[in-house]
Amino acid sequence: EAELAIVLKGPLKEVPQVDYKKAIFGYTCIIDVSARAQGRSTWRQGSWMGKSFDTFAPLGPCILTSDEIEDPNDLEVRFWNSGELYHQYNTNDMEHRVPEIIEFVTSIMTINSGDVIACGTNHEGLGPLQDGDIAEIEIQGVGRMSVNVSDPLKRSWPREIYMGPNS
């Protein structure tokens, strides 16, 4: 999942939406990798285990400071798998806007400098990664990052891409 990541500054708690910018150091790209079968087999209520393996949340290629992004809710996000465009959306299509995310997270916990929030995606154009793939994410104004996928078990899955409820 190609997502915008928020790099936080703190410590802060209870940040209202109108003050969301004071909680943000900057923005970067994150590939939110999921081992969906692992998540489903280990915990019925969700997939947190399937998102918790080493290397499953690569960040980069840089951190743009918050003043360099005029509107984090209007950025083009693209994801390629081995050169094929799989996923493209605008951050205005995320389920929750950045001010709402900051308000919600800080209502639950104190955020500290360096904490990162993955903002989510629109869930269309998702598909499996396999050994030998090159996963690339690009976010408008932030940059482009490439990751070489390595699976020592050399597993493979059908190359189906989820394109919404009718796919």
Question: Model regions: which residues?
Answer:
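Short beta-strand segments in beta-sandwich/barrel cores
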Residues: P11-K13, G143
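Short, structured patches in soluble enzyme cores that scaffold and shape functional sites
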Residues: A2-G10, T28-V33, I63, N81
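Catalytic-pocket segment enriched in acidic/His residues
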Residues: R36-S167
